[in-house]
Design a protein with these regions (language model features):
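Short, gly/Ser/Thr-rich active-site loops of penicillin-recognizing serine hydrolases
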Residues: 321, 337-339, 367-389
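N-terminal amphipathic/basic-hydrophobic helices that include classical n-h-c signal peptides
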Residues: 1-19
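Short, surface-exposed loop or secondary-structure junction motifs
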Residues: 68, 121-347
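Catalytic tyrosine of NAD(P)H-dependent dehydrogenase/reductases that use a Tyr as the general acid/base
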Residues: 81-84, 179-181
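Short, conserved catalytic-motif segment at the N-terminal edge
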Residues: 23-83, 103, 113, 163-171
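Short, glycine/proline-biased beta-turn/loop segments that scaffold the active-site neighborhood
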Residues: 106-120, 211-213
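Short, well-ordered beta-strand elements
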Residues: 341-344, 352-371
């Protein structure tokens, strides 16, 4: 979501994990854990929290490394990370829930629900569905400054979105013609949800998605507990001479002190939570995975129909780098891979996350890490090499 990649990240080659998956040789949980521990030991990432879902339950969850380097607080399944764009799965789930409740039509113009949605008109208007699957034609402006320190006031949400739309009124393509990722489209969806329900995006999501799933520690603010039991600190590997430029690139108060080869980030929030604002841990994120692996039902509670869940996972428009469903996507490199999967990544300043489901295997993986970038592919490939039961 926020590309910040100045400096050197001593990542680990993705080949080891991919070789495991391609060879098809099952590995033990112990071997998988050793692989994940090595990511910490080699400096690929300060801390990782990982969970696995099989069928309708979480079968494994563990933390590796540190949630906070200054205090040596360990990363755990309960450690909260800023989800960034992984939030879009929640936003899409919320929109589909409204559609199934008869509150909106996915194929109706989005402007019918959010009157502030004004763009230079094409022959056909932008629909809600096209916002969900990134085929609206909306631009994707760099969101590097769409953040604020956690102690700064939250701006007027609607006014913020209207200002962005005023700057990007001209669509890049005819709606529905092709797919191109747009954070702005999901900001508009957040306003659609708010206009329809009369509640804020956060209030609706808490009441209709997070609370029914028992995701009580997941929300839109950082927990008050110490790091490890609370929130992870995000890090960016950065050469020291670049530190002043890095501070200037982000809003004042977001970039924190240096810690060894890293720059730490102070707690911050995104402006417009519908595109990337959820804060939570892998332990509770598995409940969202269970919902999408089990036809819209989790712990005996149905939030979506099986048809709606299938529609979200059905990949239709093809984009330049990814092919999209409603919320979910997959990269071009994943076409034809087995087992097939859909996913959503979430990355920005100090954090990189992935939520991936393998519907044919009834398997789901959530990985959260507190560095701007790391190789999640080898991690996922290694995890699915375990014969989960």
């Amino acid at each position: 979501m926020m590309p910040v990649s100045v400096g050197r990240n001593r990542g680990v080659s993705r080949s080891k994990g991919i070789r495991m998956a391609q060879l098809g040789s099952p590995i033990s949980i112990e071997a998988m854990e050793a692989f994940l521990s090595a990511r910490i030991e080699t400096g690929a990432v300060p801390g990782l929290s990982v969970s696995v879902v099989k069928g309708d339950r979480s079968v494994w969850a563990k933390g590796f490394g540190f949630a906070d380097l200054a205090t040596s607080s360990p990363a755990t399944p309960q450690t909260s990370y800023l989800w960034f764009s992984m939030t879009k799965i929640v936003t899409a789930t919320a929109v589909l829930r409204l559609a199934e409740g008869g509150k909106l039509d996915l194929d109706a113009p989005a402007g019918e629900y959010f009157r502030g949605f004004k763009v230079i008109s094409q022959p056909t208007p932008v629909t809600v569905r096209q916002l969900l699957n990134h085929s609206s034609g909306l631009a994707n402006p760099l969101p590097i400054r769409w953040v604020r320190p956690a102690d700064a006031p939250d701006p007027d949400r609607g006014a913020f979105v209207r200002r962005l739309l005023a700057k990007h009124r001209r669509l890049k393509s005819v709606p529905g013609e092709r797919a191109s990722y747009s954070n702005l489209g999901y900001l508009v969806l957040g306003e659609v949800i708010s206009e329809i329900t009369g509640a804020s995006y956060e209030e609706y999501v808490r009441e209709e998605i997070l609370s029914p799933l028992g995701m009580d520690s997941t929300g839109f603010t950082y927990p008050e507990q110490p790091a490890g039991d609370g929130a992870a600190t995000g890090y960016q590997p950065l050469w020291r001479p670049f530190t002043p430029l890095f501070r200037a690139a982000l809003p004042r108060g977001v970039v924190g002190p240096r810690q060894g080869r890293y720059v730490a980030f102070n707690p911050f929030y995104v402006k417009g939570p519908a595109y990337g604002g959820i804060v939570g841990g892998v332990g509770e994120a598995t409940r969202l995975v269970v919902l999408h692996l089990n036809g819209g039902q989790a712990d005996g509670k149905r939030l979506l129909s099986a048809q709606a869940v299938a529609e979200m996972q059905r990949i239709t428009p093809r984009g330049g780098k990814r092919d999209f469903g409603l919320g979910w996507f997959r990269s071009h490199e994943a076409r034809g891979r087995r087992p097939a999967f859909v996913e959503h990544l979430g990355g920005g300043a100090g954090f990189w996350n992935v939520m991936r489901i393998y519907p044919e295997e009834s398997l789901g993986v959530v990985v959260m890490g507190n560095i701007t970038s790391y190789d999640h592919e080898s991690i996922c490939d290694t995890i699915i090499s375990v014969p989960w039961e």
